[in-house]
Structure formats: structure tokens, C-alpha cells
């Protein structure tokens, strides 16, 4: 049943009454309430909107109702706030029609109508503005109608010009592949983020001879398989910062889940519930606090596959990584850490299946901790594990009888420990240096083919750098850590040679790709040119012969075109290639480049 006409008119814009006719504002009472309820039961009708009525808190008077009522939902509130400024652009009659939509409480239809009318009003206003601008340009006496016509012609001309440019570009180079090649060939080179690192290490002179296998570190790490990265964390080497990078700053298909308030993150393989990282921030101290190389190599396999049968254990690849630091800075940083109350009592020091006895590893303090310890007392303790800590944690302690100092003479023991630490460090999948954060990031990315999200930051100010020591104390610290000093010198030389070798290999690969790209582009341009020339000659051979008496003209034009293209590409290549090895020329072949690098090391020596 339809709603009475008087009820429908109540929600329509008020009409001007005829002269002399009375204005009816209310419905007659002859319509029963049952009829109104039946009319309101039909969905989507105006009666349903009438029955629903306006929202809560809104008056029933039309002329006293605001333009937009405050809706109850946040999304509707945002829509209303976005549509409210458009009411000012509408005429009075259109505003009244908008109120009909508002009474139905259909914000979607209201916003669509407002946007449509608003854009039309803005276009009309812009049209008049352009007309006013043209009137100022072409003469003050021009009429508004003529200016509107000129503005329309200008817009039409701009659109036609754009379409003409698109057609010409498509005709000159119809393939998208050709367009991409031209954009890559003539675009400005992408800045190299490691250019400053190359310049800083330009004066580096190698001291050790390493083979190509020692310098080339590229691990085929299968994160979806069974491979595992094991992080050997040495105290006060920046391992905490690097460990956070591993769980929070790597681009992965399935990133690690790190929750607020939890010390460990969940680093699962894609599609599995197994971890690919064995570190403090992923598995915790599963092998003891700051476990060394001797502990990790015997503990990690049993921890990872301890619950499985030996016959069902997969053949895993354990990729060990670590971070080293300058021995003097690391020693001072550890002293400051101990001075604040650190003890590392939870360290197990398990070697050959057992922890050391109190006679083998005495303590330097008698209380609960060593807080407030002065530097002299810290250096005077002969059992301080801070002395030569990096060599001890990277070597195989079973070769020297673990912590039993009576197995062999001290001099022989030190030599065995140092050689073992060098060998383990060289055969590790990766190691970085705290003093070279950006190079550490680069080598890790190239080694494991995993990219970090944000670059590493080099901090020049640390707690150790704030400690002022004289030359005598510094020499004593170097004497207490003489094994670490030699190991760090070896590690720094190997680290910088690896960086230079990987950078040189990367530049050679980029140069080879540019040469292949240039050859492909030359062939494509020549093919397009000769095809167009052949089509023109086949269509009108007599006219082409009369217009082109010299057949070598097209060939000279093609040669000039290719010469200019080659020159521009060569200039771009020269801008991109960095200055390496004191400006010495390098070969394009990868194997030849490797031999050149090894040969340059011999010349530097």
C-alpha cells in the first residue's frame, strides 16, 4: 500500500503554493494507522524511510534541520566530514534534494551525489577562471563567451597534442622492450650506496696472501630446507646490534615475529615450524651464555636434532658467523660492563664434555660481582677471561687440553690457539668487523643473498671511546691481548680483501651486462632502420632512387647514429665505474679479473 501523497510531500522540497490556496502542513486523519504500517513494511520505499524517521537527537522540522546530522558510526562520520564542504558549491534547489537523501540516511548515495555535483561546479568555476585569464591576455574587451570558447579550444589542443606524442612514441619504438632499453641506456645512473666505502679503503695494502677460495664467500643458503645460521656472539663486539639486525632488519618471505616484551623472536622457515637462525634473539642461550666455538660445534646439532632419531636426522649445513672488534676497545668496553655489575656466571665453558674445575678456572673476585672494579685491578687478575677472549672463543680448546694449563707449555699453547682461531675464522661462512658496519652489511648480503631493509649505522662514540687512557695503559692492554691483536690484524686484512674482491666482481658483472645491453640495442636499432628503409624502397623504388642518388647516405647516417649512441653509453659507463686499485685497468672476464686481483696483491707486497 502506497503512502499518502501528503506524507510523501512532507519529505520533498517545499513548493511555492498557488496564490490564494491554503497551505496544508499536516496529513488528514482519515488515513488509518494500519495503512501506514502496511506501507512502511515494503523495503526500499519512502514509507520505510518515513517509519525509520530521522536519527536520534535530530528535530523533525525541515527548515531547522542542519545540513548534515552527526551519524553514529566513525566511517559515516568521516564521509560526512568529507562531503560537508561541497554543500557550499550547490544551488539552493539542489541542497533541498540532498536533504531528501539525508532523510533516508543513505550516506553513500549522498556522498556520490555531492562529489558529482561538486566536480561539475568546480569544472564550471575553472572554466570561468580560464576565461578571465584569457581575457587578461588577449584583451580587456573580450567577452566572457568568447573566452569560454577559447579555453575549450586550448584544452582540446592540449589533449590532441598529448595523443599525438603518444602515437609518435609508439610509432618510433613499438615494443615495450625497446622503450625499456632506451630508458635504461639514457637515464641517469643509480647512485651506488657503497661508493664512499670504496673510497675509504682505496689506500688499503694487503699483508697476507689468500686464494680465490678464501676471498670468494657465497653460501648457497636454503632457508626453506634444513640449513642453519649459527651466530657466535663474543662479548662487547657489537653482537647485540648485529643480532637484532638478523631478526628485525632482513627482507624475508616470512619475517621473524618479534613481540613487545619478549626477548626472543620466532624465526620460522616459510611453510614450516622450524627455525633457520640459532642466536640469542631466536633460540636464546640454548648452549649457555655466550657459548664459544668449542661449545657450539658440539652442542648445536644435539639441540636442533636431539629429539629425532639419528637415522632420521637431515643432513644440515651449519653456517657459523661472528663479529670481531678492535681488542683494546673491546677490552675497555668489557671492563666498563663488569664495573656496572656484569658477571656472566651463566656461562658453562663446557669443553670435552665437562665444565672446568675451580682450580682450572679460578675467579677474579670473591663477592657476588665485580662492580666498581678499577681498571688496574681488572688488568692485574691473571685468570681474567677478558684477556685474549676473541682467540679463546674462536679456537678449538680441545687441541690444548681445554682449560688445563699443564698439558703443554704456554708458548706452544698460545701458538696452537692462534692458528686454530685463524683457521676457524677463515673457514666460517661470514664474519664482520664492528669498525666497518657498512662493509659488514655488504658482505653478509652478498654471502647469503639476503638483503637488509635499512642500512647499518656506524657509531663512532661508544663507552670504550669515552675512557681516557694514556699510552702506557694502552700498551699494557695490547700486551695482555697480544693474541687478539694478531688475530684482529689477520681478520681485518682478510675482511678488506674480501670486500674489494666482491666489489670488483660486482663491477665486472655490471659492465658485462651493459655491454650485452648495448649490443642488443644496436642490433634492434639497425634492424628497425633497415626494415623501414626496405619497405620504402619496395613501395616506390624509382622515387627512392631519384631522391637518393647517393646510396651511401643512409649508411653514413646509420653509422653516425650508432656512433653517437655508443659514445653516450660509453660516457655513462665511465661515470659509473669507480676508481679501483689506484686507477689500474681491469679485465672484463671474471676469471681474468680474479687473477688480476691476486696479481695486484703480489705487486702491493
UniProtKB/Swiss-Prot annotation:
It is found in: Membrane. SUPFAM superfamilies: P-loop containing nucleoside triphosphate hydrolases. Disulfide bonds: none annotated. The gene is HS6ST2. It catalyses: alpha-D-glucosaminyl-[heparan sulfate](n) + 3'-phosphoadenylyl sulfate = 6-sulfo-alpha-D-glucosaminyl-[heparan sulfate](n) + adenosine 3',5'-bisphosphate + H(+). It comes from Homo sapiens. This is Heparan-sulfate 6-O-sulfotransferase 2. Residues 1-4 are cytoplasmic. Keywords: Disease variant, Glycoprotein, Intellectual disability, Membrane, Signal-anchor, Transferase, Transmembrane, Transmembrane helix. Its EC number is 2.8.2.-. Residues 28-605 are lumenal.
Amino acid at each position: 500500500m502506497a503512502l499518502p501523497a501528503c506524507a510523501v510531500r512532507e519529505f520533498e522540497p517545499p513548493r511555492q503554493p498557488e496564490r490564494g490556496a491554503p497551505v496544508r502542513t499536516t496529513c488528514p486523519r482519515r488515513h488509518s494507522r494500519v495503512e501506514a504500517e502496511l506501507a512502511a513494511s515494503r523495503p526500499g520505499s519512502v514509507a520505510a524511510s518515513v517509519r525509520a524517521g530521522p536519527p536520534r537527537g535530530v528535530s523533525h522540522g525541515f527548515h531547522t534541520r542542519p545540513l548534515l546530522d552527526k551519524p553514529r558510526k566513525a566511517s559515516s562520520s568521516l564521509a560526512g566530514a568529507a562531503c560537508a564542504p561541497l554543500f557550499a558549491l550547490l544551488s539552493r534547489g539542489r541542497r533541498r534534494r540532498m536533504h531528501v537523501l539525508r532523510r533516508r540516511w543513505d550516506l553513500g548515495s549522498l556522498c556520490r551525489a555531492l562529489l558529482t555535483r561538486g566536480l561539475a561546479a568546480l569544472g564550471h568555476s575553472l572554466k570561468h577562471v580560464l576565461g578571465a585569464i584569457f581575457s587578461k591576455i588577449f584583451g580587456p574587451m573580450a567577452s566572457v563567451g568568447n573566452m569560454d570558447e577559447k579555453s575549450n579550444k586550448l584544452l582540446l589542443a592540449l589533449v590532441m597534442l598529448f595523443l599525438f606524442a603518444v602515437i609518435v612514441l609508439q610509432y618510433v619504438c613499438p615494443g615495450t622492450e625497446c622503450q625499456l632499453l632506451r630508458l635504461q641506456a639514457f637515464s641517469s645512473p643509480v647512485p651506488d650506496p657503497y661508493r664512499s666505502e670504496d673510497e675509504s679503503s682505496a689506500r688499503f695494502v694487503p699483508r697476507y696472501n689468500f686464494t680465490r677460495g678464501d676471498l670468494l664467500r657465497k653460501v648457497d643458503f636454503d632457508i626453506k630446507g634444513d640449513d642453519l645460521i649459527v651466530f657466535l656472539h663474543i662479548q662487547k663486539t657489537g653482537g647485540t646490534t648485529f643480532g637484532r639486525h638478523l631478526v628485525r632488519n632482513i627482507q624475508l618471505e616470512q619475517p621473524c615475529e618479534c613481540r613487545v616484551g619478549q626477548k626472543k623472536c620466532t624465526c620460522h622457515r616459510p611453510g614450516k615450524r622450524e627455525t633457520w637462525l640459532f642466536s640469542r634473539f631466536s633460540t636464546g642461550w640454548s648452549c649457555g651464555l655466550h657459548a664459544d666455538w668449542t661449545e657450539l660445534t658440539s652442542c648445536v646439532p644435539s639441540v636442533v636434532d636431539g629429539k629425532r632419531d639419528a637415522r632420521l636426522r637431515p643432513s644440515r649445513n651449519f653456517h657459523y658467523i661472528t663479529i670481531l672488534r678492535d681488542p683494546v676497545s673491546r677490552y675497555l668496553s668489557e671492563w666498563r660492563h663488569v664495573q656496572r655489575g656484569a658477571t656472566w656466571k651463566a656461562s658453562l665453558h663446557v669443553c670435552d664434555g665437562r665444565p672446568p674445575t675451580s682450580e682450572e678456572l679460578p675467579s677474579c673476585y670473591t663477592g657476588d660481582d665485580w662492580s666498581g672494579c678499577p681498571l688496574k685491578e681488572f688488568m692485574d687478575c691473571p685468570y681474567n677471561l677478558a684477556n685474549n677472549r676473541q682467540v679463546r672463543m674462536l679456537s678449538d680448546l680441545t687441541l690444548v687440553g681445554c682449560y688445563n694449563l699443564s698439558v703443554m707449555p704456554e708458548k706452544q699453547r698460545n701458538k696452537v690457539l692462534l692458528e686454530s682461531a685463524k683457521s676457524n675464522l677463515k673457514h666460517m661462512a661470514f664474519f664482520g668487523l664492528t669498525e666497518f658496519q657498512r662493509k659488514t652489511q655488504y658482505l653478509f648480503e652478498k654471502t647469503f643473498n639476503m638483503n637488509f631493509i635499512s642500512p647499518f649505522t656506524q657509531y663512532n662514540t661508544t663507552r670504550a671511546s669515552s675512557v681516557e687512557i694514556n699510552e702506557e695503559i694502552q700498551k699494557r692492554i695490547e700486551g695482555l691481548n697480544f693474541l687478539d691483536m694478531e688475530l684482529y690484524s689477520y681478520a681485518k686484512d682478510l675482511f678488506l680483501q674480501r670486500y674489494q674482491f666482491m666489489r670488483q666482481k660486482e663491477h665486472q658483472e655490471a659492465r658485462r651486462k651493459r655491454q650485452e645491453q648495448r649490443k642488443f640495442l644496436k642490433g634492434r636499432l639497425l634492424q628497425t632502420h633497415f626494415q623501414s628503409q626496405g619497405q620504402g624502397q619496395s613501395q616506390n623504388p624509382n622515387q627512392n632512387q631519384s631522391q637518393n642518388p647517393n646510396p651511401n647516405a643512409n649508411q653514413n647516417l646509420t653509422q653516425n647514429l650508432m656512433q653517437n649512441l655508443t659514445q653516450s653509453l660509453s660516457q655513462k659507463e665511465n661515470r659509473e665505474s669507480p676508481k679501483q686499485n689506484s686507477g689500474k685497468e681491469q679485465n672484463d672476464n671474471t676469471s681474468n679479473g680474479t687473477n688480476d686481483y691476486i696479481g695486484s696483491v703480489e705487486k702491493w707486497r
